[in-house]
Every structure is written in structure tokens, then in C-alpha cells.
């Protein structure tokens, strides 16, 4: 509920989802917070209360899947107030091509400091864009960063309902625990994850400094005029 230029972050993220063109009735906020739930109700945002026992966002979506009747669930985290709606649409369209696949976003890492940053999950995948592994360590591990492409995770996911139900049956698995990356549970369960290239413009808001970065983007004259950042 932190405000960004006067608008609550969860509301901004919800607005990004609406800009994707997805039907409003199929977009909801899943939360274990009564404060967020009440805020959503006051602002006519469809929402659902989940258990405080959910250890990851994917566990939360899996709980929603048990309570609702959809075949595919797309998870955009609530701390993504300037997420590109074109990327949301891209993930939605890919679910039509791969309706039984788990889908996750990625983009190229263009700065060495981001490659070394342990807060950013790095991604390696096959020629067919199937996830091989993710790590908070720099992978592939090499000193020639400027000459070799590296990639990072973008935190938007698409899940078939059946995959979420299987995911929920297990507790955190070893690599998921050691890396603190929830998508690895699917890899450890020998389920494939299809990676899709997205833009690198989004900023996940984890600190007060991130709020300032987002406000700086929103205040730029050239983006005020566009629907992408309104």
C-alpha cells in the first residue's frame, strides 16, 4: 500500500494488468493481508484472501487455483508498478501456444553489476528456451561478461492449474531452498519451464530507493503522455 506519486503500488500494478487488455473480471489480487483486501474492495478491485501460511507467491497462486475454476493462471507480483502490459499480453499469447507449459520471463543482463548482484536470479536455458537452471550467483560463470550474453529472470509466470496442484503438494525442495528461487521447485519435480524474452524496463519495488526510481520514470515528460506509464 506504499504510495508512488500518490497512488498505492498495488493499484498501479493492477492498472498495468488492465492495460494488457485481459478481461477485468479475470484479474484479481491475491493477498493474505486484510488491509490490502479492504483496500481492493473499496477500489472495486476483484480480490481473494489467502492463507498466511503460503511460503512463496507460487504457493499463493496454487491456493487460488484450488478455490477458482480456471485452467491457466498468470502471476504478476504486486511490487511491479510499471510492468509493461505488452509483456503481460506476450505471456498470455504464449499460453495459447503452450497451454500445458509453465512459462517464465527473462531478459538480457547489460550491466556487469547486475550480473554480480545476488538479489537478481540469473537464468540459463536450452536452445528451445526450456529452463535449465536459475541461480543468484553469476551464471554462466565466466570473466568475459562483455563478450558473452547473460540473462536474468523477469518475475511474471503462467501456470497450468494441474502444475500448481502438483507444486502445492510438496514443501520447498533443496535447490529451491538454497537459491531461494521458487520456480526451481518445478525443475526439481522434473517439470519443464518455458522461458520467454521480455523487455527489461520494469522495476521491482523492494526498497524506498526503488520507489524513487519508479517515480523518476513516471515523472519523465516523454512517458507521461503514453498509456504504458500513466
Locations of the language-model features?
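Conserved core of the sugar-phosphate nucleotidyltransferase
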Residues: 84-173
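Short phosphate-binding loop-to-helix
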Residues: 28, 34-93
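Short, high-confidence coil segments that cap the C-terminus of an alpha-helix
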Residues: 24, 70, 98-100, 191
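Conserved alpha/beta core of the MobA/IspD/sugar-nucleotide pyrophosphorylase nucleotidyltransferase superfamily
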Residues: 148-230
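A conserved hydrophobic position in a structured secondary element of the catalytic/binding core
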Residues: 31-32, 83, 159, 206
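N-terminal glycine-rich phosphate-binding loop and ensuing alpha1 helix
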Residues: 1-28
Amino acid at each position: 500500500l506504499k504510495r508512488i506519486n500518490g497512488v498505492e503500488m498495488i493499484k498501479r500494478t493492477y492498472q498495468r494488468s488492465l492495460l494488457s487488455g485481459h478481461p477485468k473480471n479475470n484479474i484479481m489480487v491475491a493477498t493474505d493481508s486484510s488491509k490490502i483486501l479492504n483496500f481492493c474492495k473499496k477500489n472495486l478491485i476483484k480480490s481473494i484472501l489467502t492463507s498466511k501460511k503460503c511460503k512463496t507467491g507460487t504457493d499463493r497462486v496454487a491456493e487460488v487455483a484450488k478455490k477458482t475454476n480456471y485452467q491457466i493462471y498468470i502471476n504478476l507480483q504486486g511490487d511491479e508498478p510499471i510492468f509493461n502490459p505488452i509483456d503481460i499480453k506476450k505471456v498470455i499469447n504464449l499460453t495459447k501456444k503452450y497451454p500445458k507449459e509453465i512459462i517464465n520471463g527473462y531478459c538480457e543482463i547489460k550491466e556487469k553489476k547486475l550480473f554480480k548482484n545476488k538479489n537478481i536470479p540469473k537464468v540459463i536455458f536450452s536452445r528451445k528456451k526450456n529452463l535449465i537452471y536459475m541461480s543468484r550467483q553469476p551464471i554462466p560463470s565466466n570473466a568475459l561478461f562483455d563478450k558473452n550474453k547473460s540473462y536474468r529472470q523477469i518475475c511474471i509466470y503462467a501456470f497450468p492449474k494441474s502444475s500448481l496442484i502438483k507444486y502445492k503438494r510438496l514443501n520447498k525442495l533443496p535447490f529451491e531452498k538454497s537459491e531461494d528461487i521458487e520456480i526451481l521447485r518445478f525443475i526439481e519435480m522434473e517439470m519443464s519451464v518455458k522461458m520467454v524474452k521480455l523487455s527489461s524496463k520494469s522495476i521491482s519495488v523492494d526498497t524506498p530507493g526503488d520507489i524513487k526510481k519508479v517515480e523518476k520514470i513516471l515523472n519523465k515528460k516523454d512517458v507521461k503522455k503514453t498509456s504504458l506509464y500513466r
